[in-house]
Amino acid sequence: MKMKRYYSFLLLGAVLSCAPTKEEPVLDKLPYFDLKGFIDLEINELEGDSVLKISEINGEKQTQELRYTVKDWKEEFASFYQADINVPSLVTAYDTRTTPDQLIHELLPEAKGKVKEITIRYVQNYPAWVMFRIKDENMFYQSTTLGELFMNQVTGKIDQYKLETTQKVMFLSPTHIKISGVIH
């Protein structure tokens, strides 16, 4: 009798575990600049290109000449992907301003979000410069990241990028990380 009851609960658990999960809704129209889509589009153009990469951690520099695949570029630009703000929970969280050559998304003071600002500068209606600021903090940890991406106006491809991060964990010294790359 106990075995029969055990198998009944096991079967019920298996059936319930197969129930469809609630997925995050997909936005019909993106409310903000499509940073993720832009990066995806641009890194496909960089397949096999080489980059002179300078990494600096707490003042210690390392310079490398590297050749990246699309997968490598996606990893290199992970911070840019993290700065994408086109998610349903942030649909009303940003103030959007425009000038003749810029689009600026800035987190509203009462809104919660890690991405504080995204600025896109346009030349001939195409992004020439993209910048984002991320700040994440809690009682034990604080992190700020500034990212910039520059487009070559002649080739129409990503020309340079910069990432600067400062991480501070309670009771430890801050870690300063700078990464820059010149693509050729």
State where each predicted segment sits.
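C-terminal motif of bacterial Sec signal peptides marking the signal peptidase cleavage site
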Residues: 16-17
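Gly/Pro-enriched, hydrophobic low-complexity segments
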Residues: 103-184
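Acidic/histidine-rich, surface-exposed loop or edge segments in extracytoplasmic proteins
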Residues: 21-23
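Sec-dependent signal peptide recognition
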Residues: 4-10
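Surface-exposed acidic loop/strand-edge motifs in secreted or periplasmic proteins
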Residues: 43-124
